Amino acid sequence: MVAVNDRVKETTTTTGTGTVNLAGAAVGFETFVAGIGNGNTTYYCIAEQGGAAFEIGIGTVTDATPDTLSRTTVLSSSNSDSLVDFAAGTKDVFCTLPASKAVIEDASNNVNIGSNIIVGGTVDGVDIATRDGVLTVSYTHLRAHET
């Protein structure tokens, strides 16, 4: 599971394509360790201050000295959607929700899901179970909702 949180932002001066050393929270924000948690994965953006280089991906937060963010999977970047070889200078590193991962309600109030849905509990009060990869619902439970 990927963790996300509002107002998580730090800076880094790390160069290259490896794990990023985090330099502390920007004013008014919290650190990745505080906002996401040690060992958790999150969506991130690294953006070069005053430049065009950027990377959006999935990474893992580590509580260390200094705290780090590993760059596990790149979703998009200024380097043809590959790891960016960041040059010297300060970069902003922040938690984000990539557009490609967002679930959006369209103008007709529909939500289209392109893959699997994991439900724990009920949907509109109906218990749902899966068996052999097929969605099944108790017939008597459905009949009870008709009256």
Where are these regions (language model features)?
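Generic alpha-helical propensity signal that fires on short helical segments
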Residues: N79, A87, A129, L135-T136
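Intrinsically disordered, low-complexity, compositionally biased regions/tails
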Residues: V20-L22, G28, D63, I118, ...
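Conserved small/polar residues in nucleotide/adenosyl-binding loops
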Residues: T140-T147
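N-terminal assembly/attachment segments of tailed bacteriophage virion structural proteins
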Residues: M1-S100
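Low-complexity, small-hydrophobic/phenylalanine-enriched stretches
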Residues: K101-V123, I128-L135, L142
